[in-house]
A protein has these predicted regions:
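Feature captures hydrophobic
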Residues: 1-167
Length: 167
């Protein structure tokens, strides 16, 4: 195992083959938002978004380094191009498309680490896209979920553990 570990840096790196266009990302985003709002309580999502309670479902600034541009994402406004500004998270357009196309996309991204973020903004990232993980596990964000404190506790415990391990 020592040889394998010592030779990691000499191995070829995986590279993204091509960028996903803004138009395609916007389309995937619209499909994603419709799916999320259909499976979950639009009222609760809107309430948390507007009241900013614990910063759930807030607009997030995503820099796509292959586009060399930043975009704001919101569950209600979709994906909007903007002038480059301080991003909450940076990634390749294929990673963002993967989140939009797959309920488990966000979870996969946290495992493969194909994004950059600091601890504070990672928390915001989770609170914006983590709902897909909830849906992938067969649950929905609704008043009924509030009666399941062990699930809520598990979510926050997992968020804390992942954030603690960020560099």
């Amino acid at each position: 195992w020592k040889d394998t570990i010592n030779n990691i840096s000499s191995k070829p790196k995986d590279r993204y083959e091509k960028s996903v266009s803004f138009e395609d990302l916007k389309t995937e985003c619209e499909i994603y938002n419709r799916r999320i709002l259909k499976k979950n309580s639009k009222f609760l999502i809107f309430l948390l978004h507007k009241t900013k309670i614990m910063n759930f479902f807030q607009t997030i600034n995503i820099k796509l380094y292959d586009h060399n541009k930043s975009y704001n994402y919101s569950i209600f406004k979709g994906l909007v191009e903007l002038e480059n500004s301080d991003p909450d998270v940076s990634m390749h357009s294929q990673s963002l498309a993967f989140i939009f196309k797959n309920e488990f996309g966000f979870d996969t991204l946290t495992v493969n680490g194909c994004f950059e973020s600091d601890k504070k903004n990672f928390s915001k990232f989770v609170k914006t896209f983590g709902i897909g993980t909830l849906n992938a596990s067969g649950l929905s964000f609704s008043l009924g979920l509030l009666a399941e404190p062990q699930i809520i506790f598990s979510f926050f415990k997992r968020l804390k553990n992942v954030a603690k391990n960020l560099i």
